[in-house]
Amino acid sequence: MSLEEFSYWLIVYNHAIVTALINAVTALSIYFSLRAGIFNLSAVGFMAIGAYTAGILSTRFGLPSVVGITAGIALALVLGAVLVYPVLKLRGHYLAIATLSFAAIVQAMAMNLDSLTNGPSGLLGVPATVRAWHVVIVLAVLLYIACTLQKSRTGRAWDAIRTDVSAARAMGIDVEAYRLKAFLISTAVAALAGGLWAHVNRVVVPFEFGFVQLTMALVNTLLGGISTPFGPVLGALVVTSMPDWLAGFAEYREMIIGALLVVIVVYLPNGLIDPLVLLGRRIGLSRGAAAGGTR
């Protein structure tokens, strides 16, 4: 592929690429909760908060996108701090229902607060100031943070809590503090994804933050796997790009995508990233054995 062909390809698929990258950021927000054993379904609600805050501050007050996105993250963290204490006292499906209810309330408010959100019509004319390379940098920073946390005491505590809460407490782990950290990080990342999306899509409407979007975000995360932070990113990139891969099979596209997802879930229960992780370990072991044999 020549440089001109590559440039043309980037122009044609720019929006699809940016969408896939933002979906990867959203998947990472869910990843942080799941790592601590929190089945948190509020991600789209905090995405909406981030998107509407960024959109309102840019369209009505003319503030720079960085300010709007930062304000959206700050507001989401405040609301997340209010929500987290009653929610984290719940377990299992009760926690899932509570966080899903929060997301539904946020969407309902976006639909009905016409004077603030412009109701079902949404916010129009949000400045398109976010570029693909901006999102790449954001995603790279988030992956670095996630990988650092995974190898730290926090990551080990999350793994222990996810595996067995009672055993984690017996080991002296402050379960509530670590779950709080995971929830708030997840909240901030979701709001960041929403703010980025507002400045890419140029329109913020309530239906973009509903149950369908939540389901797709969960699919992206679980399909990729949560054994490493790269799993959700891989899942998001694969799922988001599937419709483009199957453009020549428009009539059967949804059926093919559904069948592929079922096959992956059945045969790769730990996600798409799992065989890649195992392959990396085998390569590392073989190199170590080869190095040992040459001594």
Q: Model-flagged regions — what are they?
A:
Residues 1-295:
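Transmembrane alpha-helices and adjacent helix-loop boundaries
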